[in-house]
């Protein structure tokens, strides 16, 4: 029995380190300076926002190449993830194939308003938008963001 626990712990450790560029809301993680660069700290929520600077081994996310990954932490827990996806030549807005993949992964339909697709599920927000701004490092990107409800972050 102890051997099984040791083997499972080892496999978990290897899998987390091998695919360390995937981040999920609620994960516990201590950002290390070799993998993360601090971008800022929110004065209203206390969320520490980092750019992931480690190796991106899973280069595709929802059918598009990953450009940049931004992760927000509060008290060592992931509370925000932003995957800036690189549009393919010919993409207009958020591509339908990406929308279909996201939609198949969530239980409620994505709403559309002013170029943004999104859903609020319990205490989680999901949004997709094609944009060029500071969060995308002023590059044309399809921004996929998940976040814990803002009112919870203020507590």
Model-derived features with residue positions:
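Short, Lys/Arg-enriched, disordered terminal segments
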Residues: 1-5, 155
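Sec-dependent N-terminal signal peptides
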Residues: 4-14
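Sec/Tat signal peptide C-region and signal peptidase I cleavage site
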Residues: 16-20
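Non-cytosolic coordination micro-motifs
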Residues: 21-49, 54, 80, 84-155
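Acidic (E/D-rich), amphipathic helical modules within compact regulatory domains
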Residues: 56-62
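Short solvent-exposed loop/turn micro-motifs enriched in small/polar/acidic residues
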Residues: 62-65, 112
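Hydrophobic/aromatic beta-strand elements that line small-molecule binding cavities or substrate pockets
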Residues: 67-72, 130-133
């Amino acid at each position: 029995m102890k051997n099984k626990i040791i083997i499972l712990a080892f496999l978990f450790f290897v899998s987390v380190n091998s695919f360390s560029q995937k981040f999920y809301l609620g994960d516990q993680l201590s950002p290390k300076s070799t993998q993360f660069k601090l971008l800022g700290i929110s004065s209203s929520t206390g969320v520490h926002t980092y750019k992931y600077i480690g190796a991106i081994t899973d280069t595709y996310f929802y059918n598009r190449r990953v450009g940049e990954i931004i992760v927000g932490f509060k008290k060592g827990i992931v509370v925000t993830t932003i995957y800036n996806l690189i549009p393919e030549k010919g993409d207009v807005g958020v591509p339908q194939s990406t929308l279909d993949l996201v939609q198949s992964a969530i239980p409620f339909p994505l709403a559309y308003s002013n170029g943004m697709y999104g859903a609020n599920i319990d205490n989680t927000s999901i949004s997709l938008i094609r944009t060029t701004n500071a969060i995308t490092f002023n590059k044309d990107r399809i921004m996929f963001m998940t976040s814990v409800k803002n009112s919870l972050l203020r507590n």
